[in-house]
UniProtKB/Swiss-Prot annotation:
Family indicated by similarity: Belongs to the class II ribonucleoside-triphosphate reductase family.
Record's protein name: Adenosylcobalamin-dependent ribonucleoside-triphosphate reductase
Gene3D superfamilies xref list: 3.20.70.20, b-12 dependent (class ii) ribonucleotide reductase, Chain A, Domain 2, b-12 dependent (class ii) ribonucleotide reductase, chain A, domain 3
Subunit structure as annotated in this protein's UniProt entry: Monomer.
Cofactor requirements of the protein: adenosylcob(III)alamin
GO biological process entries: DNA replication
Keyword entries, A-Z: Allosteric enzyme, Cobalamin, Cobalt, Disulfide bond, DNA replication, Oxidoreductase, Redox-active center
Residue span of region Effector region-1: 151-162
SUPFAM superfamilies recorded: PFL-like glycyl radical enzymes (SSF51998)
Residues annotated as catalytic: C415, E417
Domain of life: Bacteria
Short name of any one Pfam family annotated for the protein: RNR_Alpha
């Protein structure tokens, strides 16, 4: 790809005019969440970005991915068209009528994006089976790149997690059966030089003094590797440990490996690129020793799905400790694998590392053993359900079945809204219909811009060959809508499920309650789906590439929905009125501004050095007779709403965390069976109102809400600017925030 000599940019005069015309639709938490999540540090100005600067960066980073600009002499008409599109995108995103994924808000338009094409995609999927590294940016030197290796999917996972992405991975029986037996017991030694600032801490984690070890083991045969101070170095270290256990990647049967961690930067050192500070080598030491111990215990045996998940979880745990604030994993096992389904009941292992993934099981439409799964869900909210058969054979359920619809699907991203092939990422943009209409957009125009934004992301330079190949083949996009419940009430005055009728399931003979859907909402959603498909086809024709295999989704949203103050994805508001508690680092200069504006602030009872700020929130249409919250809407209506969106809107999948009351637990198995031909993926959690101190969300009544609001005055943004003379501090984030309602995704 040629480098552009003159990329498309947005003129300062244009941006100034937009700022006069359009007011961003900030939610109650919007500006504060943005400032501590997506506003990048500007070293020359010694402050973080303002919203218009973020949007400018994001739009310019995206529009210039259009491959027609990467030629010696781009067509002037193409340049003019894209320049106009960039202006419209700026208006759409600046007003918060729609936004790309949190990953794009953080990375698009940065040097990091240019170096790491993977960085624009939030989440990925990989199958745990031996795979070749191929022409990828990370390839072990000990064997040909064409050699299938057990380490490859774990290297892919480790790499993408450290770039801030989430990873779904499959440990279903068909994949696990392809893993060879563990052949070699490995004596792993991690050494460190005394000149390392991490020397003392590393010894505590199990490393040994390099000089002393070399003196005591002079002349011994062992593989040695000095790890470089890079992300790739961490990945390759883990690959070496795994590879030494298997015959195909350790044909000599070498039983000793020495890894030198002296060059890894110490805790607190700057991390350039993605941002943040280093953890030091200590988490890496712990992970390498734990994984080696696990594999040594299986010599002469095949790994189980639990073993394979444990390795993934140990990697995820390390990434969290390595200063990527959240590591999102979803492990997909077989529905008849009892050990996998119950693996989190081992409390010791759960607290050590098994917390690192949400676990789901793969089913098909013939599966009918829902009772054990329903009991497990009622107990701890897992496993989730993923119907791979539906994902492969259907786009929208309303459209005809086709065995070639999406035949390569093997799993999903951690939140379950995108059906994915091996090595494939999700690629998201969401529109907030209520905000878009309020700001004068025709919804067809907003969704067309969304489709084109996502399409351009597929032309990034991807680091892994497995990803490049499948992205070029599928060009998958995921245009989502969020604030769906707000939209239904605002534009149609009612929820989409108008009632239920009793019918007999022709396969089971059981009586079920079939939902009745509002025809006007159905027509509107169906029309917008075809808008996205048509926009993708037109753009694909112009670019000379394949149309996207699938186009639409409902992402769970979360942080991005907070920006605009809308309901999250298809989810119902948590309550009509509530206190939302946000945790800040104790030295955050936003805290004095929030205090000056009257927000209640108190120390976090769980974490030292953290402050909790209370934000009173009123859901849109909270007083509407048709309003329902997650605490009042039935489990049946939630699943029926998900089924509606899977039928008429999403050709990928619909991410939904269905909440249920204790008295509804006995309905879970029946509902999962009833919708086995409709719902591609779902998860369920018991509804928790405010069962512990400083809960993130606490339902309140309208009187309490008004009392809380009466104490608040002024603009936090304005007060912050005055107090800090338009300066800020670097590397501050909100604590324990996630990019989705279910908590599975990284924040950015």
């Amino acid at each position: 790809m040629q480098v552009m000599t003159k990329p498309i940019t947005l003129a300062p005069a244009f941006i100034a005019e937009v700022k006069k015309e359009i007011k961003p639709h900030w939610g109650e938490l919007g500006w504060v969440t943005y400032k501590r999540t997506y506003a990048r540090w500007l070293p020359d100005a010694q402050r973080t970005e303002n919203w218009d600067e973020t949007v400018k960066r994001v739009v310019e980073g995206n529009i210039n991915l259009d491959p027609r600009l990467h030629t010696a002499n781009p067509d002037p008409k193409v340049v003019e068209t894209l320049q106009k599109e960039a202006r419209n995108l700026f208006k759409l995103i600046y007003g918060l009528a729609g936004t790309p994924s949190g990953r794009n808000l953080w990375i698009s338009g940065t040097d990091y994006q240019k170096r790491n094409g993977d960085a624009l995609n939030n989440c990925w999927f990989i199958a745990i089976r031996p795979q070749p590294y191929g022409q990828s940016h990370i390839v072990p030197e000990d064997y040909p790149a064409s050699q299938p290796a057990v380490s490859m999917p774990y290297s892919f996972m480790f790499d993408e997690l450290m770039k801030g992405g989430g990873v779904g991975f499959s440990v279903t029986k068909d994949n696990i059966a392809k893993l060879p037996p563990v052949a070699t017991k490995l004596e792993l030694t991690v050494v460190i030089g005394r000149n390392s600032a991490s020397y003392a801490d590393s010894l505590k984690m199990g490393a040994v003094d390099r000089d002393e070890w070399e003196k005591a083991h002079a002349g011994e045969q062992a593989d040695h590797c000095a790890l470089p101070d890079t992300r790739e170095g961490w990945v390759l270290a883990n690959a070496k440990v795994i590879d030494h256990h298997f015959a195909a990647t350790n044909p000599s049967g070498q039983t000793k490996l020495v890894l030198d961690i002296t060059n890894i930067r110490p805790k607190g050192a700057r991390i350039h690129g993605f941002g943040g500070t280093a953890s030091g080598p200590m988490p890496l030491i712990e992970m390498l020793l734990d994984i080696n111990k696990l594999l040594n215990a299986r010599v002469g045996q095949h790994l189980t799905a639990v073993d394979a998940t444990d390795i993934g979880n140990l990697i995820g745990k390390t990434v969290v400790a390595g200063n990527v604030r959240r590591s999102a994993e979803m492990s997909l096992g077989s529905a008849d694998d009892e050990d996998f389904i119950t693996m989190k009941q081992d409390q010791k292992q759960l607290y050590h590392h098994r917390w690192a993934s949400n676990n789901s099981v793969a089913i098909n439409t013939q599966f009918d053993a829902y009772s054990p799964i329903a009991l497990a869900i009622a107990k701890n909210g897992e496993p989730g359900i993923v119907n791979l058969e539906l994902s492969r054979r259907f786009g929208r359920i309303a459209d005809r079945e086709n065995a070639e619809n999406d035949p390569d699907v093997e799993g999903t991203n951690p939140c379950g809204e995108i059906s994915l092939a091996n090595g494939e990422p999700c690629n998201l943009f969401e529109v907030f219909p209520v905000v878009a209409v309020e700001q004068g957009w025709k919804l067809k125009q907003a969704f067309t811009l969304a489709a084109r934004f996502a399409k351009r992301v597929t032309f990034s330079h991807y680091d892994w060959q497995v990803s490049r190949d499948i992205i070029k083949k599928n060009r998958r996009i995921g245009v989502s809508m969020s604030g769906i419940q707000d939209w239904f009430l605002n534009d149609f005055g009612r929820r989409v499920v108008s009632g239920f009728e009793s019918v007999v399931d022709p396969q089971t003979g059981k009586m079920v309650q079939k939902p009745i859907y509002d025809p006007e909402i159905k027509q509107a959603v169906d029309g917008l789906y075809h808008t996205v498909v048509d926009a993708d086809q037109a753009y694909s024709d112009a670019l000379g590439c394949e149309p996207s295999r699938k186009h639409t989704t409902v992402k769970p949203s979360g942080t991005v929905a907070k920006l605009a103050g809308v309901s999250e994805g298809m989810h119902f508001h948590y309550a009509g009125y509530l206190i939302q508690r946000i945790r800040f680092q104790g030295n955050d200069p936003l805290l004095p501004a929030l205090q000056a504006c009257g927000y209640h602030i108190e120390p976090d009872v769980y974490t030292k050095g953290t402050m909790v700020v209370e934000f009173p929130i009123r859901a849109a249409h909270a007083d509407d007779p048709a309003f329902a919250s997650a605490g009042t809407v039935s489990i049946a209506e939630q699943i029926a709403t998900q089924a509606f969106l899977q039928t008429y809107w999403s050709d990928n999948a619909v991410s939904c965390t269905v909440t249920f009351q204790p008295k509804e637990a006995d309905q879970i198995a029946g509902l999962l069976s009833q919708y086995r031909h409709v719902i591609k993926s779902t998860s369920m959690l018991p509804y928790v109102g405010a069962g512990f101190k400083q809960a993130p969300k606490e339902p309140i009544d309208v009187k309490t809400y008004k009392q809380k609001c009466a104490a608040i005055h002024g603009s936090v943004a304005a007060v912050f600017a005055v107090q800090n003379a338009d300066h800020d501090q670097k590397d501050l984030e909100l604590v324990d925030q996630t990019d989705c309602a279910g908590g599975a995704c990284p924040i950015k």
